[in-house]
Amino acid sequence: LMGAIAAALSREDRLGYIAEQPTYGMLADINAFALGARMVNPYVEVHLEWARRKEAQHTEDILHEKGIHYISGHDMINPDHPSREYGLYRKNEDGTVTNLAMPVWHWGKFYEQIIRLAFKSTEEIEAMKGKKAVNYWWGMSADVIDVICSENMPNGTRRLIEFLKNSIRAGSFHPFDGLIYAQDGSTKCTDRKSTR
């Protein structure tokens, strides 16, 4: 959804994404951002910068110099280096930052799901095999993850995101279903198939 918001608001076909390090979960986040952005604007390009680079220049400044104003940064504020550059934000021409949205994890719901799974009997788990994957990638449909929009978000975009969130929760929209291409043009998921 963060990618969809960025693509809906950007007047350019370039978005920025700042990532910590190339771990499996981080790569999935980057891909999800790009899929969401392409859902709204099929011509958009996501420019990736790694935050842990050795260069002295800030990654936000590198993207800003490329003319990229909408950036998905760190998911949370770092207490050691507080800044306004977190979540999805716009880096304005004068260098100021306008925060737009951020993901929120409901850890209580996550641990509730873990405990429910732990209390299932062996027979129940055996009966679930082949019907339901047992994993810890619970998201919006399990109320573990949400997106909070700031007051800086235009009303039309806010309504679009609420519609998408409600559709995901209701199970009527699956953002990772259907035709998905890799950067090299190869097909990663065919039409009417799911990556879930």
Placement of each model-derived feature along the sequence:
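Short beta->alpha junction loops
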Residues: H47-E55
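Periplasmic-binding protein-like
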Residues: K66-I77, L100-W105, A127
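An alpha-beta-alpha
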Residues: M2-V44, L48, K131-N152
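A structured, mid-to-C-terminal "fold-capping" secondary-structure block
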Residues: L117-D184, K188-D191
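Hydrophobic alpha-helical segments within soluble ligand-binding/sensing domains
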Residues: L1-D13, V104-I125
